[in-house]
Structure formats: C-alpha cells, structure tokens
Amino acid sequence: MNLLPFDEQKPLDFIAVGRLCIDLNANEIHRPMEETVTFTKYVGGSPANIAIGMARLGMKTGFIGRVADDQMGRFIVQYLKNNGIDTSHVITDKSGSVTGLAFTEIKSPTDCSILMYRDNVADLKLEPNDIHEDYIRQAKCLLISGTALAKSPSREAVFLALEYARRHGVVVFFDLDYRPYTWQSKEETAIYYNLAAEKCDVIIGTREEFDMMEQFAVHQHDDEKTAQKWFDYHAKIVVIKHGKDGSIAYTKTGETFVGTIFPANIVKTFGAGDSYAAGFIYGLMNGWPIPKAMEYGAAAASIVISSHSCSDAMPTLDQIEQFIQHIKAARPLQNHK
C-alpha cells in the first residue's frame, strides 16, 4: 500500500512556503557571543534549508515567500537561483520590512544557541494574494513550517496554501520548526499548530515540539498517542525526533520504525532537523521503504552538523551515499578491535 500517492505527472517535485532569512554563524567557536567578533553569512530559515537540500538531491524545487527589499533579500534570492530553485513566487516586500537575522553561538559541539532578530521581518509579510492555486497545483508535494504561522498575514497565506494543496492532491509535509520568540502565547501557538497539522499528510518534529502542541491534552509525552491523534485526521506518517537518541516513525497502517543513528564530528547542533527532513522526504518521494528514507535523513543530518553552515552543507545524493558506505565499511573493523 502506497501511503503517499505522489502524482508523477506534475512538473514540480517540491514547493516550500515560509521563512527566508540570514544565518550569521560564529567563526570563533568555543566561546560565548560576547567574545565573538566575526561571523560567516549563509542563507537560513528551516523551509529554505529544506528546499536547498531537496534541490541538491536533484528535485525540481520551488519556493513561495517574501524577502526584504535590501541587499540581504537579494542575496537570498540569488542563492536560491544558484541552487536551481524556482524563485518566481519569491516576492520582494516593499513595506520597509527587514531580513530576519539569526546569530549563532557555538560554545561547544553540544552547547549552541541562536540569537534571533525577528521584528518587522519580510517573511511574515507573506499575504494570501501571494499564494497562487495554479502554482501549488503543479507540485507533487508542499512543505509548510510552523514559524510562518506565527503572525498574520503569513498565517492566513499558509492556510490558503494548505487548502489549495488538499484540493489538488498535493502531499503536504509539516516541519514543526517551533521558535518560541515569534509567538505571543502558548495558547495561540498550540491552537494554530494543531489547526495546520490537521491538514497535513506527514508531520515531522521533536518530542518537545509535539509536547508544545499537546500542552492542553490529557495525555502527554507518549509517542504512540501523539501519532494516533494525527492519524485521526489526514496524517499518514508521523516522525518524532529524540535528538541523539534518534527518531521514530509511525504510520497510519500501524507500523513503527526506529531510525538509524550515525556518528558525526559535531561542530554545532543546529541544521540537523532541516537536513534530516530533506533526506527523509527525498526517500519517500522516490518510493523507498520508510527505514531507508530515515537512514538517508540521518546521514544528511550527520553531514550537516559536522559542518560550519547549514544551507551550504546540505549534501548531494552522492555525498549521502558515500557517507553511509564509509560508516558501514568502518563498523566491521571497529567490531573486530
């Protein structure tokens, strides 16, 4: 049984909606932000990273979003174009908005934090009029992320995109991407996350993100109950990530899969979820068994957290396969030591 019936006749493989911003990653690692003086600039934002990851894997990819009318906005659009992503629905906002900035602090491989500047950002100016039914109709799948739900009019634009996707048989992925600093209250957050999740075919998030969505529910912190809740709506697959302990995928048909964990020379922890999503979605779109899709997602995540950047480090298919082969070849040698 094919859980996700992708329409192979559609010309676009993948469209992402939402956040386009700038990551400024600390060059001086192993020190606090107060002592960091230089940063390297990259394109950032979870949906942007996932779209870049999909394009690197050879998928025909498009993006729907807004960027600021400034140098940073132009940098983002050109970067997407350079990676073969269709930017015909990336709009330059003329309202005086700014590009969102994320400064990353890398104190140690496991102690990383992000300082966000999100006031009056262009990506949250996305309007329903920016969402075109004919464009979404052409895609096999659509990705939304939670940050775009944080404020109007972006919130309404996302729900319109969901409506068009459901109308035209477009498979919908929801990357939860919860960022508390963009929301006004826990009640608002839970309400809109739940309303969006009800319309999605695949939901991917951390245990903590699902806990946020379930904060008013009777049962919490139970992966199986979490998955079953969404199977009562449209969801076919729910993936719950547990950080260094790996991920678990549940299907509406009652299957459970525990994901592979790969070693990594960790530079920073952020970016793992975005690269995992790209590898996992790519596998599902190619009709792979869920465990194989999870394996490629985990391998992509290990590659990215071993790198300084997120978007620049999104791997190609060859890089993922070489990484997996290298790790599997090394394991027998380790077992004989």
From Swiss-Prot:
Q: Which GO terms describe its biological process?
A: inositol catabolic process
What are the recorded GO MF terms, alphabetically? 5-dehydro-2-deoxygluconokinase activity; ATP binding
EC numbers, comma separated: 2.7.1.92
| InterPro entries, sorted | Carboh/pur_kinase_PfkB_CS (IPR002173), DKG_kinase_firmi (IPR022841), Myo_inos_IolC (IPR030830), Myo_inos_IolC-like_sf (IPR023314), PfkB_Carbo_kinase (IPR050306), PfkB_dom (IPR011611), Ribokinase-like (IPR029056)
Q: In which pathway does it act?
A: Polyol metabolism; myo-inositol degradation into acetyl-CoA; acetyl-CoA from myo-inositol: step 5/7
Kindly state which reaction or reactions the protein catalyses.
5-dehydro-2-deoxy-D-gluconate + ATP = 6-phospho-5-dehydro-2-deoxy-D-gluconate + ADP + H(+)
For this UniProt record, the keywords arranged alphabetically read as follows: ATP-binding, Kinase, Nucleotide-binding, Transferase
Q: Which HAMAP family match?
A: IolC (MF_01668)
Q: Which family does it belong to?
A: Belongs to the carbohydrate kinase PfkB family.
PANTHER family reported for this sequence: 5-DEHYDRO-2-DEOXYGLUCONOKINASE, HEXOKINASE FAMILY MEMBER
| Function statement | Catalyzes the phosphorylation of 5-dehydro-2-deoxy-D-gluconate (2-deoxy-5-keto-D-gluconate or DKG) to 6-phospho-5-dehydro-2-deoxy-D-gluconate (DKGP).
What is this protein's record name?
Answer: 5-dehydro-2-deoxygluconokinase
- List the taxonomic lineage: Bacteria, Bacillati, Bacillota, Bacilli, Bacillales
Query: What's the encoding gene here?
Result: iolC
